[in-house]
Amino acid sequence: LCLLLAGVFALLGMEVSSNHDFTWVYPLCILLEWAIITTLMVGLFFLFQRHGAAPAVLAFALFVLGIAEFFVITFKSMPIQPGDLSAISTAAAVAGNGYTFSISLFCVLSMGFTAIAMLLCEYAGLVAPHRQKGAVNAKRMLLTNLLVAVLCLGGVTAHVTLIDYYNTLGITVYTWRPLESYWREGYLPAFISAAQSIKPPKPADYSVDDAKATLKKYAKAYDLSLIHI
């Protein structure tokens, strides 16, 4: 229960900095985002043998992501998209040259939500049983923790890699107004959908040889048109 609530506050800690009007957010998208965050928290919790530090670090990392999103939106009125990750060094150099970093009240509110999430994670670690009497019981608990962690972390990995967010879930990032998509659908679902669209699926009848032949055909036709001119 503590981790379920921690997932809610971690989500708020990430989103509220830049997306504080939840009246137009799609409920199912936010529910999906909460499920992803909470499952990751549970997986880390059991991976580190029921200690709350790991999910607390995740909550803080999401807060940092939300603050970065706030600054990027303030700077260029666009969200952080998958393609931006290849230009982090350039963005940091530009931002460090005369750019004034000032936070808003919503950033402070996000900080409060993140603090609550981290406290809930630590409390979950305090109330959870850590040791069992006897070597057999201790080994059983260790294996159980690792199994739950693998199921949670592996489940999230399989979910974001195997499920087509665009065609199956209908989560669309509009090219001309991506910020609206991120605000309406939640940062993580929109980011995952955008990342999946970078590499489009290969058509069933696609052939490299046919593609090369088509290119040569068009190149030859273009060369002939130049000769006639």
What are these regions, as identified by a protein language model?
Residues 1-176:
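Transmembrane and membrane-interface helices of multi-pass
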Residues 155-223:
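Membrane-interface segments at or immediately adjacent to transmembrane helices
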Residues 227-229:
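Conserved small/polar residues in nucleotide/adenosyl-binding loops
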Residues 23, 224-225:
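Short low-polarity hydrophobic stretches
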